[in-house]
UniProtKB/Swiss-Prot annotation:
Pfam families: Casein (PF00363). Keywords: Milk protein, Phosphoprotein, Repeat, Secreted, Signal. Its main location: secreted. This is Alpha-S1-casein. Sequence repeats lie at residues 85-99, 125-140. PROSITE patterns: CASEIN_ALPHA_BETA (PS00306).
Length: 214
């Protein structure tokens, strides 16, 4: 019914063109009242004051509802756009965190490998060279001492093998710390040869002594 009345009023207004109402700077309530007066003035017997007030309130409520709906739509659009922006950011953060975890592990492995390369590899390269030198010196000693007793050769072997095994044992026992290694240049004291042991001193007549018979 109200819509029918409003359509009739609009048709009447279009049929009677007048000068436009200057409503710049006026509030919404004043504009609604002016519009109602403009439409209702030609039909005072149809619309009373109560009808005019009801129509004005209805128009005001409809305008406020329209504004509220527009505001809600704008808020929903903003929330959707903000959620779309937040989701890629969270996905990128998760991807970065997943990449950081293995990178830390690989860094730890690389540090360990660098330590092993720094401390172990030079010593592992030195040990075979030292062994070759000692073998060469041992062979020369064997050729030089062919006419001498085998005591000197046995002493050379007794000095060579414990020293070589001791160095390899140290490398296996402490793989990641250079301060545990005994310097390779250290020389252990040679064992005294049997020829250097002083002979016991005794009297020449010790072999001719006679034991008394009881």
């Amino acid at each position: 019914m109200k819509l029918l009345i409003l359509t009739c009023l609009v048709a009447v207004a279009l049929a009677r063109p007048k000068q436009p109402i200057k409503h710049q700077g006026l509030p919404q309530g004043v504009l609604n009242e002016n519009l109602l007066r403009f439409f209702v003035a030609p039909f005072p017997e149809v619309f009373g004051k109560e009808k005019v007030n009801e129509l004005s309130t209805d128009i005001g409520s409809e305008s406020t509802e329209d504004q509220a709906m527009e505001d809600i739509k704008q808020m929903e659009a903003e929330s959707i756009s903000s959620s779309e922006e937040i989701v890629p950011i969270s996905v990128e953060q998760k991807h970065i965190q997943k990449e950081d975890v293995p990178s830390e592990r690989y860094l730890g492995y690389l540090e360990q490998l660098l330590r092993l390369k720094k401390y172990n590899v030079p010593q592992l390269e030195i040990v075979p060279n030292l062994a070759e030198e000692q073998l060469h010196s041992m062979k020369e000693g064997i050729h030089a001492q062919q006419k001498e007793p085998m005591i000197g050769v046995n002493q050379e072997l007794a000095y060579f093998y414990p020293q070589l095994f001791r160095q390899f044992y140290q490398l296996d026992a402490y793989p990641s710390g250079a301060w545990y290694y005994v310097p390779l240049g250290t020389q252990y004291p040679d064992a005294p040869s049997f020829s250097d042991i002083p002979n016991p001193i005794g009297s020449e007549n010790s072999g001719k002594t006679t034991m008394p018979l009881w």
